[in-house]
């Protein structure tokens, strides 16, 4: 099973990354969060909305 990791970056912001079973990073949060709690809320939002998200192709 994959896992979300919460960590603190060099500027002191909380960030998350999603790792696959093999340890490969497959997604990262696009922003830094001021608190660990707000970072976890960001993860929960991704989990909630990605379950029903469409896949759309966009042209460059």
Predicted regions and their residues:
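Amphipathic, hydrophobic secondary-structure cores in small proteins
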Residues: 25-33, 38, 42
């Amino acid at each position: 099973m994959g896992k979300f990791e919460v960590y603190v970056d060099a500027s002191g912001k909380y960030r998350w990354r999603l790792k696959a079973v093999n340890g490969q990073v497959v997604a990262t949060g696009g922003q830094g969060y001021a608190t660990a709690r707000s970072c976890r809320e960001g993860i929960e939002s991704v989990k909630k909305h990605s379950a029903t998200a469409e896949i759309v192709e966009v042209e460059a």
